[in-house]
Regions:
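A composition-driven surface/loop motif
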Residues: 1-171
Length: 171
């Protein structure tokens, strides 16, 4: 997902995205250092008329949902459905790829499982990068690798006001 527009994806039925080398499973990357930053919002939702799920797996160095290698995964909202996001090597489940931060991530519904891989956050930054402005207001969230920055990166402005959240740090 690139460009300046907003993208809203309605989850109906079971969906699976698996990426190749250096890419995210569902990519919403901001490469500010090599071109125009992406300014749109990616929203995943399920209107509950048809049960919806998404399983997104990043390729080597790519987030499950968010940034490719060296890409920031930002401006991502999950409003519902069952979402499972697994990062590739050194990448977040939801947020930054290896070398990328995770910013402005909101979860306000659904069941979300986010697995960071090898020193990355479950939700937030890839290895050695920050995770910031992460908000959880509802739903059930399980984050392996924790919530915030990857190993060597800072986590800041993490707000949890509702839902059921389990966050476990990892290596």
């Amino acid at each position: 997902v690139q460009g300046k527009g907003n993208v809203e994806i309605e989850l109906d039925g079971d969906n699976e995205l698996k990426s190749g080398f250096n890419r995210a499973g569902l990519e919403k990357t901001d490469f500010t250092f090599i071109g125009t930053p992406s300014t749109g919002m990616l929203t995943l939702k399920d209107d509950n008329q048809k049960a919806g799920s998404l399983k997104a797996t990043g390729g080597q160095f790519g987030a499950g949902i968010g940034g490719a290698e060296n890409g920031n995964g930002k401006d991502i909202t999950i409003k519902g459905g069952t979402v499972t996001a697994t990062g590739g090597e050194f990448a977040a489940g939801i947020g930054g790829g290896f070398g990328g931060s995770g910013e402005n991530i909101t979860i306000n519904g659904g069941t979300v499982t986010a697995d960071g891989n090898d020193w990355a956050a479950g939700i937030g930054g890839g290895k050695e990068r920050e995770g910031e402005n992460i908000t959880i207001t509802g739903g059930t969230v399980n984050a392996a690798g924790g919530i915030g920055g990857g190993t060597g990166g800072n986590g800041k402005n993490i707000t949890i006001t509702g839902g059921t959240v389990t966050a476990k740090g990892g290596v």
